[in-house]
Structures are given as C-alpha cells and as structure tokens.
Amino acid sequence: MAVQQKIRIKLKSYDHSLVDKWALRIIDVVKQTDAIIFGPIPLPTKSHVYTVNRSPHVDKKSREQFSFASHKRLIEIINPTSRTIDMLMKLELPSGVDVEIKS
C-alpha cells in the first residue's frame, strides 16, 4: 500500500463571500491537475467582541461593543502532483484572505 501525500489549505477571512469565492477558485485550479480534492469544508466561525468605554473620564455604565467574525474553510488535496503545486503557487490571492498550507 502506497503512502498518500496530503496538502491541507486553510483559508481565513472576515468576509465569508471572499473566502467562498477563493476556495472555489482553488478547487477549479486543482481539478485541472487531476488531483483528488475534498472541500471546501466550513470550519467554525469565531466571533470576537470588544467592549470599550464611550467616554474617557465618566459614565462607566456607558459602553459600546464592537464585534467581527472570522470565517474559515479547509481544502484537502490528496496525492498532489508537481503541476498541482506549481499552479497553486501561481495563484494571486487578495489581501483580505489569509492562507495557511500544511503538508
């Protein structure tokens, strides 16, 4: 039984439509190279809430909350070829998407 190579790509952004769009674009590129692909798998959305005082001196009870959510997607590529890796390296992702690649 041969050992299978795996590449895991995690996409993270504050805009869910941007993550979905680029996940589909990565999948289209990988499908052209005949590699096996799983995904995009939606990972749990993390919500961050920050509470700040409205006034710098008085009114401790008067506060304002700011929140944002970070959306994540996971794409797994099984048995990638050198052509697959070359095509992934040529992709130019926007600045709003954070990419983490593990093999």
Curated annotation (Swiss-Prot):
Q: Which domain of life is it from?
A: Bacteria
**Which is one Gene Ontology cellular component term of this protein?**
ribonucleoprotein complex
Assigned keywords, A-Z: Ribonucleoprotein, Ribosomal protein
Q: Does the keyword Ribosomal protein apply?
A: yes
PROSITE patterns membership: RIBOSOMAL_S10
- Tell me the GO BP annotations in alphabetical order: translation
Task: Please tell me whether the keyword Glycoprotein is annotated for this protein.
Answer: no
Gene3D superfamilies in the record: Ribosomal protein S10 domain (3.30.70.600)
* Family, as annotated: Belongs to the universal ribosomal protein uS10 family.
- What NCBIfam families has UniProt attached to this entry? PRK00596.1, rpsJ_bact
Q: How does it assemble?
A: Part of the 30S ribosomal subunit.
Q: What does this protein do?
A: Involved in the binding of tRNA to the ribosomes.
The entry's protein name is Small ribosomal subunit protein uS10
Q: Which organism is it from?
A: Chlorobium luteolum (strain DSM 273 / BCRC 81028 / 2530)
Upper taxonomic classification of the species?
Bacteria, Pseudomonadati, Chlorobiota, Chlorobiia, Chlorobiales
